[in-house]
């Protein structure tokens, strides 16, 4: 929800938070560390150009999840030089319209290579695949060794988003 008032953003976040709690779902807010702290969301996801992880940790303290966007093993290594996130959001899997200035497409081979390098360097931070993922991609992506997937357009653009989400959950 870019470009909306802080009041509308907080009102919407609180509504989503209630739904997440009703379904025992984790509520991660993109980029807005102060909103996460104010409403007590579960955590924040920080993009490459967002607040540094260490600064977010100082503001939030322990007990909040902090995720970090990466597109390569080099990004992972660079991130770990200054801070340790709770997970890496890694992608894009394929082209997606939900993100401008898209990084190079990873596909399953990219995920396998990144996870292989992480194992080689004894890095055990969860990887969440993101970017252009559809329901049919999930088995192959999970077989690469990722720990989870993030979906947006494939759910929101479905004719029946609730049924689509139920179908996705049945694959996990």
Residue ranges and their predicted role:
Residues 27-42, 71-85, 117-123, 127-129, ...:
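Catalytic cores of alpha/beta
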Residues 43, 47, 61, 67, ...:
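Glycine-centered flexibility sites
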Residues 4, 8-11, 44-48, 68, ...:
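Alpha-helix N-cap and loop-to-helix initiation/capping positions
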Residues 1-8, 12-17, 22-31, 37-43, ...:
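Conserved alpha/beta-domain cores
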Residues 9-28, 56-72, 104-128, 135, ...:
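Alpha-helix-loop-beta-strand connector modules within alpha/beta enzyme cores
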Residues 1, 48, 69-72, 91-93, ...:
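Short secondary-structure boundary segments
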Residues 48-58, 89-102, 138-171:
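Glycine-rich phosphate-binding active-site loops on the catalytic face of alpha/beta enzymes
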């Amino acid at each position: 929800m870019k470009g909306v008032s802080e009041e509308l953003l907080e009102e919407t976040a609180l509504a989503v938070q209630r739904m997440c709690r009703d379904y025992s779902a984790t509520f991660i807010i993109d980029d807005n560390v102060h909103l996460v702290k104010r409403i007590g969301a579960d955590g924040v996801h920080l993009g490459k150009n967002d607040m540094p992880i260490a600064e977010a940790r100082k503001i939030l303290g322990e007990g909040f999840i902090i995720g970090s966007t990466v597109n390569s093993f080099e990004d992972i290594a660079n991130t770990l030089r200054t801070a340790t996130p709770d997970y890496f959001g890694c992608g894009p899997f394929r082209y997606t319209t939900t993100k401008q200035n898209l990084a190079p497409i990873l596909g399953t081979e990219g995920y396998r290579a990144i996870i292989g390098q992480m194992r080689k360097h004894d890095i055990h931070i969860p990887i969440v695949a993101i970017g252009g993922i559809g329901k049919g991609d999930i088995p192959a992506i999970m077989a690469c060794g990722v720990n989870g997937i993030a979906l947006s357009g494939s759910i929101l653009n479905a004719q029946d988003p609730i049924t689509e989400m139920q179908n996705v959950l049945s694959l996990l």
